[in-house]
């Protein structure tokens, strides 16, 4: 059986990425799970392996950001050419990446543009959690200031993200009828409009359209309960309206 080929970008050469990559690939279980290709500055992927370079935190941010972005570009090119089957990205310094000429808020936006894919969803998946069950979270909006979220969040966006999520759950997890939860924007799903109208104005129309399209979606469900309900098996994935509400639950 041909092993899965994985490109690993080393991230910011001044940071923890190369060191973490070296430690991970030294683990026999990880190293035996796939065929890994390190992608980064030549000094870091030379004959002595990851960590052989002499980059330090004192090195300039533009230079470090430039090579970190170039590693992602190279990995995407390899994936599109069929040379690798997947990409793993080590941490980057977003400010350095910007200083290096890569004008993206983060990895998801960069990967989407380099791959030429207009419709994408950022899906975080953990097959085991502290509560036992799996948790899959999609961020409807990603790297935005919180004050910009209400303007960016639309019914069209929620329909797109939930539909992409359902398609992915069928294709990658073989779940025939995925159950999607739409997380509320406001505390207690706004308690009938007492504080905020996003649930009635944005989430409710999205739910109607999803039902018409055959997507099994429920909501709006308050953030303080929806993730626990998902881990306990009630939902296969949660659509979070903004970055931190989804990532805080996922990383906990």
Protein language model regions, located:
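Anion-binding alpha/beta catalytic cores of soluble intermediary-metabolism enzymes, centered on
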Residues: 1-198, 204-252
């Amino acid at each position: 059986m041909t092993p899965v080929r994985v490109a690993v970008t080393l991230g910011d050469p001044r940071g923890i990425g190369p060191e973490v990559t070296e430690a991970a690939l030294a683990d026999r279980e990880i190293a035996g799970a796939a065929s890994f290709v390190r992608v980064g500055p030549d000094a870091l992927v030379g004959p002595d392996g990851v960590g052989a370079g002499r980059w330090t935190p004192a090195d300039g941010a533009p230079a470090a950001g430039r090579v970190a972005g170039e590693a992602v570009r190279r990995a995407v090119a390899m994936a599109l050419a069929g040379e690798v089957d997947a990409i793993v990205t080590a941490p980057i310094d977003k400010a350095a990446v910007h200083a290096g000429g890569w004008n993206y808020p983060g990895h998801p936006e960069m990967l989407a543009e380099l791959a030429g894919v207009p419709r994408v969803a950022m899906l975080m998946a953990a097959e085991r959690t502290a509560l036992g069950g799996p948790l899959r979270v999609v961020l409807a909006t990603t790297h935005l200031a919180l004050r910009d979220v209400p303007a960016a969040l639309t019914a069209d966006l929620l329909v797109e993200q939930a539909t992409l999520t359902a398609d992915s759950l069928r294709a990658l997890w073989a779940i025939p009828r995925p159950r999607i939860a739409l997380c509320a924007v406001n505390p207690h799903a706004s308690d009938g409009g007492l504080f905020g109208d996003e649930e009635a104005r944005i989430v409710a129309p999205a739910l109607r359209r999803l039902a018409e399209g055959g997507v099994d979606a429920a909501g709006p469900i308050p953030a303080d309960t929806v993730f626990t309900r998902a881990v306990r098996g009630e939902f296969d994935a949660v659509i979070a309206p903004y970055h931190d509400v989804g990532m805080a639950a996922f990383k906990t």
